[in-house]
Amino acid sequence: MIACAPPRPSHPVIGSKNFTEQAVLGELLAQEIEATSHLKVERRFYLAGSYICQQAMLAGRIDAYVEYTGTALTAILKQPLPQPGHRDPDAVLATVRRLYQQRYQIAVGPPLGFDNSFAMVIRSDDARRLRLTTLSHAAADTPHMRLGVGYEFEQRPDGLRGLSAAYGLRFNGPPRTMDLGLLYRALNDHQVDMIAANTTDGPIQAFHLTVLQDDRHYFPPYQAVPLVRDEALRRWPQIQTALDALAGRVTADDMRVMNEAVDGQHRDPAEVVREFRAAHGL
């Protein structure tokens, strides 16, 4: 008796990792494919982390999902990150694109338009008062600032120690280490003056906070990019039309608003994505 693989679906299958932003991006990709191709799209969201999504791609259980270039480079491709100051987003993207094609026959689509990286965040009234837009600008003022960080950021090799060295940052006392969920409350309550967060966190938008630009490119690039199996693109070339339509269309502010709508307002990701697409002429 010959063992047969399960039949492939007659329609594209879009996956996602297991957090809100990923479900939103998976839904965005699915809706855009449906709108531009009139294909039926199956959703398989919340598939745990990058490794599970990659295995699902290789097995043909999903045809596409959205990944982040720095994660793809280190977690999937097992490549070392360039040294701080040499982490050009285009160079990282080119390496990821080349190796995914060589190793896995997976196409890396055009970036959606935003990074989800670490971010140093301050209150907007402080940003205006001190005229701060970049971390380089902030270095002169950090001796008067109290810092709040999550446990991981304090320990990571690409976290606080390296960041402080790259920018010459000194703070008013040791950092206050706390659960990530408490950082924004501490910042709003003036218990700290700067926090280490993530660029697409919903509270940044909800509380009108300011992200200081990483102008020396210390943090690795984590551009959001769609990954699609070559076989799926050959079978449904209309998918490429959807990828091209989404290229550069999602800003970090857009992502914060959508994340906050789902997490903070408990709205359905599909509804949030439909509103985003309508507002942006997609």
Regions found by a protein language model. Name each.
Residues 2-3:
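C-terminal motif of bacterial Sec signal peptides marking the signal peptidase cleavage site
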Residues 20-40, 157, 161-165:
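Short, polar/charged alpha-helical segment
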Residues 40-55, 173-185:
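Short helix-initiation/N-cap motifs at beta->coil->alpha
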Residues 50-56, 61-66, 228:
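The structured alpha-helical core of multi-pass membrane proteins
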Residues 57-58, 138, 186-188:
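Hydrophobic residues within well-ordered alpha-helices
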Residues 9-21, 39-45, 143-148:
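Short, well-ordered beta-strand elements
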